[in-house]
Amino acid sequence: MRQFNLLLVFCLIALTALPVFSFPNGLTMDSIDMEPMGAFDENGAADESPRVKRYGGWGGRGGWGRGGGRGYGGRGGGWGGRGGGWGRGGGGRGFYGGGRRGWGK
């Protein structure tokens, strides 16, 4: 069982790193202007677009901050939030977990 858990963690880390390897050659972080996209806008937490509903955003509805929702950090699940787990609905067995659901349910 321990080996399965290690394999699962390794796979999740590998999947997280995939976008790094698929970064286009001619594109650099300096050439990307994030402000017109509204990526760091204060109202981004209240955005109700399908992308934010699904992936969380940057803090309001999940994301990597506090908030809630389904991202990598808010109440709803992820690393460091109140919910725990890697999923939508909260905790179960997450690193900081304690909710009713776990692991993507």
Swiss-Prot record:
Keywords: Amidation, Cleavage on pair of basic residues, Neuropeptide, Secreted, Signal
UniProt subcellular location: Secreted
The keyword DNA-binding appears for this protein: no
Gene Ontology biological-process annotations: neuropeptide signaling pathway
Entry-annotated residues carrying Tryptophan amide: W64, W86, W103
Chain positions listed as propeptide in the UniProt record: 23-54
Cystine pairings recorded for this chain: none
Signal peptide start-end: 1-22
GO terms under cellular component: extracellular region
Modified residues (Glycine amide): G59, G68, G73, G80, G91, G98
Function: May have antimicrobial activity.
Family: Belongs to the YARP (YGGW-amide related peptide) family.
Protein name per UniProt: Neuropeptide-like protein 32
Organism of this sequence: Caenorhabditis elegans
Gene for this chain: nlp-32
